[in-house]
Amino acid sequence: MKKEKLLINAKRVLKNSYGPYSNYTVGSVLVAKDNKLFLGCNVENAGIQSICAERVAFTNAISSGYREFKEILVIGKNKNDKYLKETLPCGYCRQFMCEFCDKDFKIITYNEEEKTFKEYKLEELLPYNFNL
């Protein structure tokens, strides 16, 4: 999948993000094995734990019957509405991804200032995942 197409979709869904407590907004685009796209944005709540954009995209895909994935692109903004140089999944999201993705699953970040993409394998970001 072309990264530019993923970026356009990530920026679009980022606008729906709800982050009034952390002032940190995130958008993500998950790509299934058949190239279907699933979007996600973070949603914060004062009363319970928030849900990250990556897990929103995954649960959207899983509830639609998908279980096999190729890659995800993640972007974020800070409280000043400036794009972050790199937005990486939190530890909880990394472990969540391990449930559904192999070690070569790609995590793509984007640096808006430099107009560059960076790719990681899931295994690089979580080399020792929890397993039952």
Regions found by a protein language model. Name each.
Residues 25-32:
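Short beta-strand scaffold segments in enzyme catalytic cores
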Residues 41-56:
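Compact, glycine-rich, soluble single-domain proteins
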Residues 19-22:
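Short loop/turn motifs at secondary-structure junctions and domain boundaries
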